[in-house]
Amino acid sequence: MPKKVSKETQQLSLQISHTISCSLADSKPYCQKIFSSSIACQPSYIRKNGLLFTDDSLQWLKSLCDNSVDLIFADPPYNIKKADWDTFHSQEEYIQWSLKWISEAARILKPSGSLYICGFSENLADLKHPAMKYFSSCKWLIWHYRNKANLGNDWGRSHESILHFRKSKKFNLNIDEIRIPYSEHTLKYPAHPQAESSQYNNGKKSSSTWTPHPLGAKPKDVFEIPTTCNGMGEKTKHPTQKPEELLRKLILASSKIGDIIVDPFSGSGTTLVVAEQLQRLWIGCEKNEEYNSWAIKRIDTIIPRTIEQWITFDRENSKRRESIR
């Protein structure tokens, strides 16, 4: 029996039903370069900077053209039986399915593009090696959080992993957009010569001095960002929703204004919301209509801020969290 959708979903579906008949060519000029002429479905939601589709992710990815998008963020099922869309019979079946959509993701990425995949370390460890045949390199990132209780009788989970696949050696990475605050020790001694014994000076005396970068230190491969929780304005009922702060870091790192961001498992819309905040073009796909209704509501109620204000917003939140520990 089909799952019943909420009244909110039905109301939002009625509000956007008139967009279903719009053609892709008429709705967004850049779509002509991204979608093949054989695309089967029309967008469920159209906005100036983006499109949202209700469709199966793998089939939908096949409708996108080669070398057409700048960045893909994917938060696929984790094979942990957490929802009715996460019911693989075995890890082998899960890996084979994952490689199918990853190959399509690699195909549609521009040579300078990146694919970020979020998941549990034990799954991504099985996936990384076979997926590398589609990419030039990969960086393993850690999203660490402190605000989840350990409700079991085992090691409590306090992180998820993110694989950063790069299609070529000439991938985009905007270091200055994602710099982090220096430590108190560094700021206490802001200018100093490299000591003769320093590993960075090769045992040679140097008269040159090091000074902190005005935007902060270079980013590390561990991000400490809380999970979404009750009381946060962005929180929805989605069981695996990712925080906007995490997506802002990744999108700022690997794209620029006007780039095309794709999320083939867009869920409650965090990637789309953040792309809209940061003045990127975006295209999302999610087969669950209720999740799409939550995404649409979030996109329609975005608080207007400049990119610089969003960066400052996240830095101030990070400092606040540090100060109350």
Where on the chain are the PLM-derived regions?
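Cysteine-dependent PTP/DSP-like catalytic domain, specifically the C-terminal lobe
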Residues: 290-325
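Core catalytic lobe of class I
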Residues: 1-34, 39-294
